[in-house]
Structures are given as structure tokens and as C-alpha cells.
């Protein structure tokens, strides 16, 4: 005999079924399609397809899910049952096939299984159904009483008021729909304006960044120009200081320095003259004559004087004078020394010609109220320098028939006259 075990889905307690329930719970073999039993079918006459149908109807609400393993009762699944028993050996092949098919449907979730509840769970289920039935009957009675008393009926005035209110609500709805459409249009227009504003803002941001870049470049150029301006201002200030300093400097006295060193006259650190006790080289004397020639020519050019009879050509230690009447005549203002120095008539003629040019400058500078007044006189015909302010002695500038001391003294007087001439020209013509 088959053995089937069931558990209560709610309390998970084992159920003990009666014989009739157990026989009805056995899976029935499928009925033949022709309505007749197959040969060898040993099914009992009392088992019909109706019983199978009843068994299927009892499976409504059942679930194929397994009950919880801890044995607790789930309130949400109080009416759900699962077949957990195992089917014993069946004597009929059709019953075995039906059982295998049902098991496959249960496992695949395509069929549900139902089995009876225990007595306590059944009582609990009936109590819940009674409560729901009582609530439903109470609602039904309330509706019935309202219908009888006319509480749900409305008068004509109330219906008219409701219709008027409905029309007002419809008008309000139409107005709100129109407002909604206006709002939508405004939103669309605002969205377009926003998009345009965002595009304009992006363009303005780009322009701002470009302006900042341009500003940075201009600021850098400004700083560079400020640095250059500072440098130029410093250079200008330095130039002004130098200009002011140069204004205080006399170009004549700065270019030609003349002083007396004992019995010798000195021009630009070159001694003009020689003594037996002071041996001055002829190269130094020649250079001193070149400086004196340059000074006399500069003074003449300053006052606009053109020399007559001679043209002064300063060439350092080889300066000379050239006759204006005879181009072949050159009078050297230099000498190479030797025993016949004081017998050199050409050298003496050059020095006398130099005194002639100096006398021409003196005569031109003496003109006017602020004329030049030299401390020593010049006698061109005899080639003498006269001590006008002293004892009136004269000293020859020639070397012929003269001593070194007297010749050197005449040269010193000549340089002193040049110093006075420098001061006069600087005070009158220096701007």
C-alpha cells in the first residue's frame, strides 16, 4: 500500500489522514482519450475523473514553494501547502506515469499541490473568514440602509449647484489649461532666451579672457617701457649733470693748460725752453711749439682772425709756418738739436714769424671796450719780448747770438701772454 506524508503549511505539523482522504489524495492515472479503459487497467470502479477534478479544484491557492526550514508559521502564507511525502511503489504503470508527470510539474513550478489543514489551522482560517464575512455584511447593510433612507439621493437644486460647480470647474480647468499653455510658451521662450544668454555669456567669457591676455601683454610692455623710461631718465639725469659740470669747465683752459715751472714755461705738460742746468729734450720743446701753434690758431679762429703774411700749420712736434707770398717757403717750428742750433737762422725766422702772428692776434683782440691787454709787449721787427710792467727789459726770441737763459725767458713771457689770452677769450666767447 502506498505511503504519503503531508505537513500542515501553517504550523508544519505532520497530518494524519483518514483512509478516504488518503485514497483521494493519490494521483490518478490519466483517462484514455477514447473514454474506455485500456486493457489490463486495474483501477477501482469508484475512482473517476470527477475525483481528479475535485482534487485539482482543492489545489487553488496552493504554492509549490517549500515551507521554512525552522518550522515557524508565516502569516502571509497561512493558506499555502506543499506536498513533501514520497510516493511508494505503485502497482499500475499508468499511476506511476501520472505520479512522475505530477512530480515534474511540481518541480518545474507549473502545478500546485494541495493537502488538508490541521484542525487548529482550519479553525483559525474559519475565524478569519467569519470576520471578513461579518465586515462585508455590515457594509452591505449600511449601503442598503442608505438606499432606503435616500441619503445618497440628491435634490434638483443640489444637482444644479453641482452642475454649475462642474461648469465653473471646467471653465477653471480651461483657464488653467490656457495658463499652462502660456506658461509652456513662456518656458520655451525663456529657454531660448536662456540659451541665447548662455551663448552670449560664453562669448563674453571668451572676450574677457582675450581682454585679460591683451591686458597682460600690455602690462608687460608697460613695465618694460617703464624700465626703459627709468633708464633713459637716469641717462638724461647723468647727461644733465655732465652738462652742468661741463658748463662750468672752460674748454680753452681745459684744453690748454699753461703754467710756470721755475724759469721755464709749460704748456700741456711740455716745457718750452732749456737751461744749462735743466736739460730739456728737443723733442719736448718741438711738441711744446706744436701746442703753442695750435693754441694761437684756435684763438685766431675764435675771434675770426685771418693771419697775414703767414699761414700757421700745427702738426705736433713738426709744426711750421708757410709764407703766403711764397708757397715754397716753410719755416719750421722744430729743431733736432746739435752744436749749430743757435746758428740756425731758419728756426729763428720761424719763431719771429710766430711772434708776428701773435702780434696780429693781439692787435685784433685789443679792439673794443673789452679789449685784450697783455702783460708783455711784442716787438716783431727785432723779435723781442718786452717786460712792460717791470724794468722794461727785452728778451730776444731768436737763438742766434743769444743765451739759453734769455731765450727761455722770452719763451716764458710768450706763454704768459697766451695764458692771459685764454682767459680773455674764455670770458668773452665761451657760451
UniProtKB/Swiss-Prot annotation:
InterPro entries: Atg6/Beclin, Atg6/Beclin_C_sf, Atg6/beclin_CC, Atg6_BARA. It comes from the Eukaryota. It is found in: Cytoplasm. It holds the Pfam family APG6. Its main location: cytoplasm. Residues 17-74 are annotated as: Disordered. Changing residue 190 to L: Decreases interaction with ATG14. Increases slightly homodimerization. Residues 173-243 are annotated as: Required for homodimer formation. Residues 125-248 form a coiled coil. Disulfide bonds: none annotated. The keyword Cell wall biogenesis/degradation does not apply. Changing residue 208 to L: Decreases interaction with ATG14. Probably strongly increases homodimerization. Gene3D superfamilies: 6.10.250.3110, Autophagy protein 6/Beclin 1 (1.10.418.40). One of its GO terms (cellular component) is phagophore assembly site. Signal peptide: none annotated. GO terms for biological process: autophagosome assembly; autophagy; cellular response to nitrogen starvation; endosome to lysosome transport; G protein-coupled receptor catabolic process; glucose homeostasis; late endosome to vacuole transport; mitophagy. Keywords: Autophagy, Coiled coil, Cytoplasm. GO terms for molecular function: phosphatidylinositol 3-kinase binding; protein-containing complex binding; protein-macromolecule adaptor activity. Present in fetal and adult brain (at protein level). Homodimer (via coiled-coil domain). Interacts (via coiled-coil domain) with ATG14 (via coiled-coil domain); this interaction is tighter than BECN2 self-association. Interacts with AMBRA1, UVRAG and PIK3C3/VPS34; these interactions are not disrupted by starvation. Does not interact with RUBCN. Interacts (via N-terminus) with GPRASP1/GASP1; the interaction is direct. Involved in 2 distinct lysosomal degradation pathways: acts as a regulator of autophagy and as a regulator of G-protein coupled receptors turnover. Regulates degradation in lysosomes of a variety of G-protein coupled receptors via its interaction with GPRASP1/GASP1. Belongs to the beclin family. This is Beclin-2. It comes from Homo sapiens.
Amino acid at each position: 500500500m502506498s505511503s504519503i506524508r503531508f505537513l500542515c503549511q501553517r504550523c508544519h505539523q505532520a497530518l494524519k489522514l483518514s483512509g478516504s482522504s488518503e485514497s483521494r489524495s493519490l494521483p490518478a492515472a490519466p483517462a484514455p482519450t477514447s473514454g474506455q479503459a485500456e486493457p489490463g487497467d486495474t483501477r477501482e470502479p469508484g475512482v473517476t475523473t470527477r475525483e481528479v477534478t475535485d482534487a485539482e479544484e482543492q489545489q487553488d491557492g496552493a504554492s509549490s514553494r517549500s515551507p521554512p526550514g525552522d518550522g515557524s508559521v508565516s502569516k502571509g502564507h497561512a493558506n499555502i501547502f506543499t506536498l513533501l511525502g514520497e510516493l511508494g511503489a505503485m502497482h499500475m504503470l499508468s499511476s506511476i506515469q501520472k505520479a512522475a508527470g505530477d512530480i515534474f510539474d511540481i518541480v518545474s513550478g507549473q502545478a500546485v499541490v494541495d493537502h488538508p489543514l490541521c484542525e487548529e489551522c482550519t479553525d483559525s482560517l474559519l475565524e478569519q473568514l467569519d470576520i471578513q464575512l461579518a465586515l462585508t455584511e455590515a457594509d452591505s447593510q449600511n449601503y442598503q440602509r442608505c438606499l432606503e433612507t435616500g441619503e445618497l439621493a440628491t435634490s434638483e437644486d443640489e444637482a444644479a449647484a453641482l452642475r454649475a460647480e462642474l461648469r465653473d470647474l471646467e471653465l477653471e480647468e480651461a483657464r488653467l489649461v490656457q495658463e499652462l499653455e502660456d506658461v509652456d510658451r513662456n518656458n520655451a521662450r525663456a529657454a531660448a532666451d536662456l540659451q541665447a544668454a548662455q551663448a552670449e555669456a560664453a562669448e563674453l567669457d571668451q572676450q574677457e579672457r582675450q581682454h585679460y591676455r591683451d591686458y597682460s601683454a600690455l602690462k608687460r610692455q608697460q613695465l618694460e617701457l617703464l624700465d626703459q623710461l627709468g633708464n633713459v631718465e637716469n641717462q638724461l639725469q647723468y647727461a644733465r649733470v655732465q652738462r652742468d659740470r661741463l658748463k662750468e669747465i672752460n674748454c680753452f683752459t681745459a684744453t690748454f693748460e699753461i703754467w710756470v715751472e721755475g724759469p721755464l714755461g709749460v704748456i700741456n705738460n711740455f716745457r718750452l725752453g732749456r737751461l744749462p742746468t735743466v736739460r730739456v729734450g728737443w723733442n719736448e720743446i718741438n711738441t711744446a711749439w706744436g701746442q703753442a701753434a695750435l693754441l694761437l690758431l684756435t684763438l685766431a679762429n675764435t675771434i675770426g682772425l685771418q693771419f697775414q703774411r703767414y699761414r700757421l700749420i700745427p702738426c705736433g712736434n713738426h709744426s711750421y709756418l708757410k709764407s703766403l707770398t711764397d708757397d715754397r717757403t716753410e719755416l719750421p717750428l722744430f729743431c733736432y738739436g746739435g752744436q749749430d742750433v743757435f746758428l740756425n737762422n731758419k728756426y729763428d725766422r720761424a719763431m719771429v714769424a710766430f711772434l708776428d702772428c701773435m702780434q696780429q692776434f693781439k692787435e685784433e683782440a685789443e679792439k673794443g671796450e673789452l679789449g685784450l691787454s697783455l702783460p708783455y709787449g711784442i716787438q716783431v721787427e727785432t723779435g723781442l719780448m718786452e717786460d712792460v710792467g717791470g724794468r722794461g727789459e727785452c728778451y730776444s726770441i731768436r737763438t742766434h747770438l743769444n743765451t739759453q737763459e734769455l731765450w727761455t725767458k722770452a719763451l716764458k713771457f710768450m706763454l704768459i701772454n697766451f695764458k692771459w689770452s685764454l682767459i680773455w677769450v674764455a670770458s668773452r666767447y665761451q657760451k
